[in-house]
Design a protein with these regions (language model features):
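Short beta->alpha linker loops
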Residues: 10-13, 77-79
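Local beta-strand N-terminus motif with an aromatic residue
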Residues: 3-4, 31-34, 70, 92
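Short amphipathic alpha-helices and their capping/turn segments at secondary-structure boundaries
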Residues: 18-29, 111-119
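Beta/alpha (TIM)-barrel catalytic core signal, keyed to glycine-rich beta->alpha loops juxtaposed to Asp/Glu
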Residues: 42-175
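Active-site groove signature of glycoside hydrolases
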Residues: 26-48
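Acidic-and-aromatic substrate-binding clefts and catalytic sites of carbohydrate-active enzymes
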Residues: 1, 11-18, 45, 102-107
Length: 175
């Protein structure tokens, strides 16, 4: 177990449901702790408000860390605004968000958050390193759980991965 790093997530925003998610993950994984537990899909200010109120999911994360059931706390996010709110209010160990050359060049999405994370020593786990664009026709998407079209050209994939790994990320999740 010490040689494996287990990360789990909860999409629940209240303490009771997020605690059930955690306990279920521990049971299914047959372990008494996970290394990283993440608030998943923090997209809106409402997600932030729900997760951080007195009976919110953050209560579960903090308590679980105190109990030794979780070593590190993190969140996944596609909103710079929400990510900054979370970072300003809690001491997170990691963030999972898109680090992709196209998003940075076209929308300036990422550089500010990368700097904040670097300054606060928050580990960056990169998503969507090989994203190309939204599917033109989502009904014919090749990968059922992938809402964007990944790159399919080997040279572009290599360049995209090289770019993502040139950023201060600790890992990336393909595609």
């Amino acid at each position: 177990r010490k040689q494996i790093f287990l990360a789990c997530k909860t999409g629940k925003r209240n303490s009771q449901e997020s605690r059930l998610d955690l306990e279920n993950s521990l049971r299914l994984l047959k372990t008494d702790y996970v290394d990283l537990y993440q608030l998943h899909g923090m997209k809106t200010k409402d997600d932030f408000i729900q997760a951080t109120r007195s009976d919110g999911a953050m209560e579960t994360l903090v308590t679980a860390r105190e109990e030794g059931k979780v070593r590190y706390l993190g969140f996944s996010c596609h909103s710079i605004e929400v990510a900054k709110l979370l970072i300003d209010h809690f001491n997170f160990d990691s963030i999972l968000f898109p680090v992709n050359w196209a998003l940075i060049l076209k929308n300036d999405f990422g550089p500010e958050l990368i700097k904040i994370c670097k300054d606060k020593n928050i580990a960056i786990l990169a998503l969507k390193a090989m994203a190309h664009k939204l599917w033109d026709n989502p009904s014919i998407r090749k990968y059922k759980n992938c809402w964007y079209q990944p790159l399919d050209d080997t040279k572009m994939i290599n360049l995209s991965v090289k770019f993502t790994l040139s950023q201060p990320v600790v890992s990336f999740l393909p595609p």
